């Protein structure tokens, strides 16, 4: 819709939605000097965690480390509000190590609101955004502002949509439903239609959340306790953000034969299995009924009981989301050991909502159809706070650069999980909620959480998101790591040293004369912590320095090989494709490739190669066509020959 009413107020950037993507986008744009406004339906539910009150986990923790390395805030908030932390996959290699923190959800939201309120250049507004104002240009529409439910118009040079599950949101308990973005909060009206009027395609997805149970009604003493085991690990690379508060335990129970029978008997009462809705749900976070159907041979499934905060009795029943009616939900809960007397405080529900398939976006997260309009978070088809926060930061950076007339920042797939995720989103026709996984990256040994600062903090500094203090911390850490690696490569443990027998026994290998500490670390089962225990390393050296030096040394051969692979792939995959390339006119491409390439308009050869339906033969044909055009462009005119 064209701007027909004088704006009530004007900003450089408007962010629509106050979830994890919106907060990250708004703070980023404001810190880059843009006059920014964050519009949200409910200022009391800023950065709410409507599902699991947790941050991190496999691949997700790497995303959080990356956002922090660039100057984002999700890692700082998670460190400041953590009530339990664990290292997942600790027995495996560093490529899949993952920090996961249970957070105090109310404290997390409160601290984010405080941060927003004290960020210069950032205004907060509570309103429902229902329309998008645009201005026609020669070749496409340009965003010029937003319109609210009550008719106010706000001008902006860039708008970032981060509406989460609120566009056309509808929550379901059994076959009963109501319009809502999540329990207790109204859905957003009008914005889906506004996008469709501008020519965007929308579709529907589904997600869900389990019931909340009163802690006081659970026999926790009968259940397996899962205490915190990573109090000295943090998401942020900034020690000023580290908080070591009182930790709380989680507990583990399991489904029973009674649980499974109840579910099988009542499947038809869910909205999905009853045929009421057909929206796709998240593959990697299935409902309990999906688990029973998909894994019919399993007698039992593990269920985690996770506290939602220090000052609330609410327990999140992880692994037990369901779309069954409320009375049956209570029966299901009471079929679990330790929950025979469970009091259900909030029922489980599923929510289906409108989303914007992300093939309509550029890698900068700007829409292809409307200049200055960006989209981030669950609206793009992702699931998870971490995925949302990462997209929010990217959209905030690129909205600021759009206004400043600068080239957008593109995150290459091989350089970060952020890049992997965005490349997947804009290249693949995804029709189910997307979550980041370590298996999605071909370069996961390089893309670890511990080295996210080394990969991305220089970029954050160049962008203006890393201040002098953070930069000095980063440089100090690099210098300390280099000194420690040099020490490990030069200091030798002699067979005659007092600790040598104990080291030989632990590693199961003899020391022949002497061995450098670096070679000792390369032995299976020997770690930096063991060097400290044997007095071979300084216990006062910061843990990130010790662990980073160990990984660099222990896996040096693998790291070098993977870096060589990355460099080789870069040379070809980062070749730019012309924005106006007419794929329909390239006869050597298959019909499907012409259609897919023309629809998605990839920006690089690498992105083109990852589009489903585009074969390696098509990429070869495209490369040959580009080379031919390049030679033709370089050839002298016929009359000059």
From Swiss-Prot:
Keywords: Cytoplasm, FAD, Flavoprotein, NAD, tRNA processing. The keyword Aminoacyl-tRNA synthetase does not apply. GO terms for cellular component: cytoplasm. One of its GO terms (biological process) is tRNA methylation. InterPro entries: FAD/NAD-bd_sf (IPR036188), GIDA_C_N (IPR049312), MnmG (IPR004416), MnmG-rel (IPR002218), MnmG-rel_CS (IPR020595), MnmG_C (IPR026904), MnmG_C_subdom (IPR047001), MnmG_C_subdom_sf (IPR044920). It holds the Pfam family GIDA_C_1st. This is tRNA uridine 5-carboxymethylaminomethyl modification enzyme MnmG. It comes from Parasynechococcus marenigrum (strain WH8102). The lineage of its organism: Bacteria, Bacillati, Cyanobacteriota, Cyanophyceae, Synechococcales.
